[in-house]
Amino acid sequence: REKILSDVVWVIRRFQPDIIITRFPTTGEGGHGHHTASAILANEAFTAAADPNRFPDQLRYVQVWQTKRVLWNTFNFGGNNTTREDQFKVDVGGYNPLLGKSYGEIAAESRSQHKSQGFGVPSSRGESLEYFKATKGDQPVNDLLDGITTSWNKIDEGPAVKKMVDSLVAGFDFLHPENSVKGLV
C-alpha cells in the first residue's frame, strides 16, 4: 500500500495538478476493487503530497504540492445513481465546429473501441451534464477552476511569457499564420 501511495504522491508532486478527478467512489459501489483503490489512493495522496514528512526521499527531486481539490465524478449507471442536484455540474455536451462533432459523439466513438467491456453506446448531441462532488478540498461553486490561478502569473517566468504571447496575438496575420512560427519556437 505504501509503495503504490508513494508512486501516486510522486506523480502529484512531479506534475502539480490543481485538481484531481476520480471516476470512482472510495466506498465500493463503483465496480471492482481496482476502481475503489484508485479513488482511495487519490484521496490519501492529496494529503500526503503536501506533507514534507511523507516520502521525504522524493524531495531531492520534487517539492511538496497541495492540490486544490479532489472531485469525484459521480454517476448514474447500472441502476446506481450517485448524482445529486446540489453537486457541481459541468455541461460536457458542447459541439466542436472544427471537428464537426459534439463531445458526446467523440466520447461514444472512443467507448466503442473498448470492446472487452461492451462500452459501445449510441452517440448523443446536446446538453450532457456531469456531476462532481468534492472529496478533498472545497466544492467549486461557479467554475471547475474556482480559486485557482489560471494566468501566466502562476509560474516564475509567467510575466515574460504573457508579454510574448500578447505580442504574438497582437501581430497575428490570419492570411499568413506561418509568420508566427518563429515567435512560437
Language-model regions, residue ranges each:
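Active-site beta-strand->loop->alpha-helix modules in alpha/beta enzyme cores, enriched
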Residues: 1-55, 76-77
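The feature marks non-catalytic terminal segments
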Residues: 48-185
